[in-house]
Curated annotation (Swiss-Prot):
Annotated S-S bridges: none
Ranges where the N-acetyltransferase domain occurs: 7-148
Keyword tags: Acyltransferase, Transferase
Name of this chain's protein: Uncharacterized N-acetyltransferase SAV1176
InterPro entries: Acyl_CoA_acyltransferase, GNAT_dom, YlbP
Species of the source: Staphylococcus aureus (strain Mu50 / ATCC 700699)
GO terms for MF: acyltransferase activity, transferring groups other than amino-acyl groups
Length: 148
């Protein structure tokens, strides 16, 4: 199992994200999330990643309900939004995305995910359910609920 590290919000993190911008889908770019927040490293950073050597190979953001949206699931007091899960092509098929999902599940809170870029089946494979709704961009909304 890989070590999942919280990524600080600073210029170094922006440089690490550059590799993802070089190949990725523009919907997954995190540059806007970093703009204006790079004065000091933040202990409240929502960004997590897996390093392969000194290169960031996989990343995601875990946001709290209300950080980027209004309450979406009225059935839950609180939940996590798993946002922009991405693995660089040369590191795909090594289980890194699954490890990030398992890390998010370890908080034992409901998780909302958006099925972008053909990821819906991946989330379904990991126990998420399709809530039969679309976000404002037309992507599928999925939910994982912990067993209580």
């Amino acid at each position: 199992m890989s070590e999942i590290k919280r990524l600080e919000i600073n210029y170094k993190t922006d440089e690490l994200f550059e590799n993802f911008r070089a190949f990725g889908n523009k919907d997954l770019y995190m540059v806007n999330e970093l703009n204006g927040q790079m004065i000091d490293a933040s202990s409240d950073s929502p960004f997590y990643g897996i390093f392969v050597g000194d290169q960031l190979g996989a990343r995601m953001a875990l946001l709290k309900k209300g950080d980027v949206e209004e309450i979406y699931f009225p059935d839950f007091e609180d939940y996590i939004l798993l946002w922009k899960l991405e693995v660089l092509p040369k590191y795909q098929n090594r289980g890194y995305a699954s490890e990030l999902i398992d890390f998010a599940k370890s908080f034992n809170m409901p998780i909302k995910a958006i099925g972008r870029n053909d990821s819906k089946d991946f989330f379904l494979h990991h126990g998420f359910t399709d809530v039969e709704a679309k976000n404002i961009e037309g992507h599928d909304v999925l939910l994982w609920k912990p067993i209580r």
